[in-house]
Amino acid sequence: MCVEILGSGHRDIVNGSRFYDEQQRGLGNYFASYVYSELESLVVYAGIHVQCAGYYKMVLKRFPCSVYYKVEGDVVKVWRILDNRRDPHWVDSQL
């Protein structure tokens, strides 16, 4: 199994990193490192998470975000990493 992060997922990580750097210098790098580490865990744990709008949803523990992904054969495709504090209707519109 391998993990592929789509362009939208990379953009979400960059945007999240910028947001957290504005909150505290260095926090953005920590956010990005943590998210990439969690994405690597999908090699083992892909498919065990709750499904939402046709995507698996992995809720992150250290930041209020969720990873939305699909499993296609032996590839985990990461579509979005979205803030859980957003309006649920907005989240649905992004998927």
Protein language model annotation of sequence segments:
Residues 59-62:
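A short catalytic or substrate-binding loop motif that flags glycine-/basic-rich loops and adjacent residues
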Residues 2-56, 72-75, 94-95:
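Basic, Lys/Arg-enriched alpha-helical interface segments
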Residues 66, 70-95:
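Enriched for short, Lys/Arg-rich terminal
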